[in-house]
């Protein structure tokens, strides 16, 4: 017997929607005030109720990077990218964090994807060049 499976999506109540909106706005404002740890805590509440909220994942990643929590930031960027792979800024920011970690080849790969999605992305172009130069320095030293 073959069963047909369907994905069950949680339907939020109006109260939960209000809670998500409240914590998202609160997180965004904390970020503007440079209270990144508080922002991350609020994004966690948003994500708990709406795990596919790719903007919350992206913003959380950005605030984690600002706290120098690079591994956690990359993990969050990966989720955001999985949920919304066509946003060039997601790839660019992940590349920037990888660049900070001296993961030059991985950074270049992210910038390449970003530039395929948005060939005019000046930030991706600039930092791709920087990552390639740093990558070249490593090869010259060995």
Positions of PLM-derived features:
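Conserved structural position within tetratricopeptide repeats
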Residues: 47-48, 79-82, 115-116
